């Protein structure tokens, strides 16, 4: 029977970051992930990292190993309406407003550091049951079919004083889970532009929904938010037709070239009211799933990770005790709910083509451009969160 102090469910970027933050804590840590190691490291999704996230990754000792693309300027505008603004890193005396990296590359750098620390990672091992008890959580670990460990004769029990769930979707229908279906899908792809990205990102609000372009390597990572019906139409047209549609949305500001294969996924808001329970804490997508309009998901998750690690380091003793987890939850309330509702408000205002809202949107963008303190507030929230370090 394994008896770690901390069982981390999920060896993606969030779970690996937590293990790395606690590597010198004296806690016995084990990670388990149902996926093969290669699948985690090959994840092609792109993540927008805020400047505050860079500071955390530097403290974890992995920043210099990451192949990141900096975002030095963010241009925000709307199609067919007035109002625009541009956020510039030099205005805040920062090297960049944010950075873009593939999820697989980030997981690879974090995993290499975790492996160097000697913390065990159980790949292709699914946690099929969690049973909280007075002094521990009993977890059932099962090797996934076809994995090297699948010949083990019995399911392996594990008794952990604390379980951190850092993978998987939230339980639909749970009384503690708030859900909102935005009736939107995101199309994601890579797209080339003449002249390269020059470390610029674009957020363009259109009648069909917002479009984000993030500089990544030598081209842009594209995220287009549309209705499910419109997503069907855009997936059915050929590459040339799709590029023509994008050109129409952006006008002459950018000249688009080739586009990669498009993928889609549904969008919604889902979060736990309480990120901590009986000897269990939920992180990342297991705690909240946000709309990508503000790029806050992973950045919020990493702030949660850092706060949890800090709480465990300050409260020595039982890591799964109620007082410890209450202290963690209290410390994250302002930033966590601020990010959730900030993102939800952006979706409601900027993903709606109702005429009065379109005018409000234009006025808001104009205000951001003309009122530096307001622009600074938005920029600093995106870079650092509500309670992150400056």
Tell what function each PLM region has:
Residues 43-79:
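N-terminal FAD cofactor-binding segment of flavoenzymes
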Residues 2, 68-175, 180-188, 194, ...:
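Conserved N-terminal helical subregion
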Residues 233-320:
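FAD/FMN-dependent oxidoreductases across multiple families
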Residues 4-31:
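N-terminal Rossmann-like FAD-binding beta1-loop-alpha1 element of flavoenzymes
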Residues 310-390:
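C-terminal helical "tail/cap" subdomain of flavin- and related membrane-associated enzymes
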Residues 144-149, 153-157, 162-255, 259-262:
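Conserved FAD-binding catalytic core of PHBH/FMO-like flavoproteins
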Residues 23-45:
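Glycine-rich FAD pyrophosphate-binding loop
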């Amino acid at each position: 029977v394994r008896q770690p102090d901390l069982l981390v469910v999920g060896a993606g970027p969030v779970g690996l970051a937590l293990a790395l933050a606690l590597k010198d804590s004296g806690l016995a840590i084990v990670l388990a992930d149902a996926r093969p190691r290669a699948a985690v490291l090959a994840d092609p999704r792109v993540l927008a990292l805020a400047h505050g996230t860079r500071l955390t990754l530097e403290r974890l000792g992995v920043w210099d190993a990451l192949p990141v693309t900096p975002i030095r300027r963010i241009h925000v505008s709307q199609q067919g309406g007035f109002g625009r603004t541009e956020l510039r890193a030099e205005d805040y005396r920062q090297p960049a407003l944010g950075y873009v990296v593939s999820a697989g590359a980030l997981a690879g750098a974090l995993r290499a550091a975790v492996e160097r620390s000697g913390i065990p990672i159980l790949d292709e091992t699914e946690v099929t049951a969690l049973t909280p008890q007075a002094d521990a959580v009993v977890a059932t670990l099962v090797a996934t079919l076809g994995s090297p460990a699948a010949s083990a004769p019995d399911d392996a029990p594990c008794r952990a004083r604390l379980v951190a769930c850092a993978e998987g979707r939230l339980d639909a229908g749970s009384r503690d889970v708030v859900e909102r279906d935005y009736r939107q899908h995101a199309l994601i792809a890579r797209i080339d532009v003449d002249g390269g990205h020059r470390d610029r990102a674009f957020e363009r609000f259109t009648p069909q929904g917002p479009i984000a372009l993030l500089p990544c390597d030598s081209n842009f990572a594209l995220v287009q938010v549309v209705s499910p019906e419109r997503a069907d139409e855009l997936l059915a047209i050929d590459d040339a037709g799709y590029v023509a549609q994008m050109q129409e949305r952006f006008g002459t500001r950018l000249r688009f070239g080739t586009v990669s294969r498009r993928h889609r996924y549904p969008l919604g808001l889902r979060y736990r009211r309480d990120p901590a329970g009986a000897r269990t804490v939920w992180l990342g997508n297991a705690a909240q799933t946000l709309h990508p309009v503000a790029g806050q998901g992973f950045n919020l998750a990493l702030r949660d990770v850092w706060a949890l690690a800090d709480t465990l380091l300050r409260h020595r003793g039982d890591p799964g005790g109620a007082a410890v987890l209450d202290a963690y939850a209290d410390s994250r309330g302002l930033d966590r709910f601020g990010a959730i509702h900030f993102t939800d408000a952006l979706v409601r205002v900027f993903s709606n083509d109702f005429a009065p809202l379109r005018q409000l949107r234009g006025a808001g963008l104009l205000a951001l451009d003309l009122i530096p303190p307001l622009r600074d507030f938005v920029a600093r929230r995106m870079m650092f969160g509500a309670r992150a370090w400056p």
